[in-house]
């Protein structure tokens, strides 16, 4: 008689079967994150293409914003809902549209649709990077880096209008529409003088500079290890040896600046840290704007410029330009308010 010792194999449930199917090796990995990413990305992109192709902004902004109305790639947009709707989610079955799809598009419901599905799509893409990193066995710094763009999207398209009176003050989804929003931020918030904007610019441009320097330095110090027609053919993805000389690169920059990175890990962490921190700082600044927080106000210069016509600085010039943006942009940007500015309140002074 034979006695078998051991555990009976556990019965596989539907969760295990689904887990196997989602993580199967295929051309486009799905994964659990794909259940969020793919539907949301598809709906956000589809909503944007539909809106820019066919949907007018006449009822919300008093403008034409689609290819059907004669716009082009730079001028079409999916526009924000009207100011009167506040922070309504603008659901298709909500009290505004009452299930009428055409009316829902006319009232700006597509903007909420694209913004919310876009936000969840970006989050799904970050989760995808976490999931694949875990399966491959690498650290999740790609996902951490992608938190920067997510922070910017959420702060600009969701947090800022939530701090203002309605979704109307968020940027519409279009090229020229984003430019309008930038002018709005400058005129109403003096955004370029905000220290968080300065940190964001330093991070993005600093990251671009580091990327250019790093790429050029690596190309400069490639080992001449082949007789191939060009240096790129000499590289094998599985080769054990280095493909460029860190020692030579270190010596080069030591001669240029008197200082250089000697640790590859610190160098690449720095290249990650600079742009991502810049994006996060910009996001924090936008949340501050949502709450109408002021940045730098050099009141002493403004007072002196008001008293002395011969005194002005670049700061006082910019303040006057901001007043001009507010006075001339508000009637165009918010026609529903029916703003009328008398001649005497329009900005005058040395700058204009």
Swiss-Prot record:
A plastoquinone binds at residues 214, 261. Its EC number is 1.10.3.9. GO terms for biological process: photosynthetic electron transport in photosystem II. Keywords: Chlorophyll, Chromophore, Electron transport, Iron, Magnesium, Membrane, Metal-binding, Oxidoreductase, Photosynthesis, Photosystem II, Thylakoid, Transmembrane, Transmembrane helix, Transport. The D1/D2 heterodimer binds P680, chlorophylls that are the primary electron donor of PSII, and subsequent electron acceptors. It shares a non-heme iron and each subunit binds pheophytin, quinone, additional chlorophylls, carotenoids and lipids. There is also a Cl(-1) ion associated with D1 and D2, which is required for oxygen evolution. The PSII complex binds additional chlorophylls, carotenoids and specific lipids. InterPro entries: D1/D2, Photo_II_D1/D2_sf, Photo_RC_L/M, Photo_RC_L/M_CS, PSII_PsbD/D2. It catalyses: 2 a plastoquinone + 4 hnu + 2 H2O = 2 a plastoquinol + O2. GO terms for cellular component: photosystem II; plasma membrane-derived thylakoid membrane. 2 of the reaction center chlorophylls (ChlD1 and ChlD2) are entirely coordinated by water. This is Photosystem II D2 protein. It comes from Synechococcus elongatus (strain ATCC 33912 / PCC 7942 / FACHB-805). The lineage of its organism: Bacteria, Bacillati, Cyanobacteriota, Cyanophyceae, Synechococcales.
């Amino acid at each position: 008689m034979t006695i078998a010792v051991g555990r009976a194999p556990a019965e596989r449930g539907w969760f295990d079967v689904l887990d196997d199917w989602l993580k199967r090796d295929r051309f486009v990995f799905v994964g659990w994150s794909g259940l969020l990413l793919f539907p949301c990305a598809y709906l956000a992109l589809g909503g944007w293409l539909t809106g820019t192709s066919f949907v007018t902004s006449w009822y919300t902004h008093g403008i034409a914003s689609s290819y059907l109305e004669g716009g082009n790639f730079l001028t079409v947009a999916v526009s924000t809902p009207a100011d009167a709707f506040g922070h309504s989610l603008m659901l298709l079955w909500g009290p505004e549209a009452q299930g009428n799809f055409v009316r829902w598009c006319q009232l700006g419901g597509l903007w909420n649709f694209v913004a919310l599905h876009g936000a969840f799509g970006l989050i799904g893409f970050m989760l995808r990077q976490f999931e694949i990193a875990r399966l491959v066995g690498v650290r999740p710094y790609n996902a951490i880096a992608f938190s920067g763009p997510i922070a910017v999207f959420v702060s600009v398209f969701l947090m800022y209008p939530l701090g203002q009176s309605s979704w109307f003050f968020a940027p519409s989804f279009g090229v020229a529409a984003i430019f309008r929003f930038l002018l709005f931020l400058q005129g109403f918030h003096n955004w370029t003088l905000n220290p968080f904007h300065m940190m964001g610019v330093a991070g993005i441009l600093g990251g671009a500079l580091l990327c250019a320097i790093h790429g050029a330095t690596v190309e400069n110090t490639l080992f001449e290890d082949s007789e191939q027609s060009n240096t790129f053919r000499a590289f094998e993805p599985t080769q054990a040896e280095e493909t460029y000389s860190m020692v030579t690169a270190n010596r080069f920059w030591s001669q240029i600046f008197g200082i250089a990175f000697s640790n590859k890990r610190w160098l690449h962490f720095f290249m990650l840290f600079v742009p991502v921190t810049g994006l996060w700082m910009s996001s924090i600044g936008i949340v501050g704007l949502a709450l109408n927080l002021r940045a730098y106000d050099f009141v002493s210069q403004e007072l002196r410029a008001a008293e002395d016509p011969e005194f002005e600085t670049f700061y006082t010039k910019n303040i006057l330009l901001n007043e001009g943006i507010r006075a001339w942009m508000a009637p165009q940007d918010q026609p529903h308010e029916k703003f009328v500015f008398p001649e005497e309140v329009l900005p005058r002074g040395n700058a204009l």
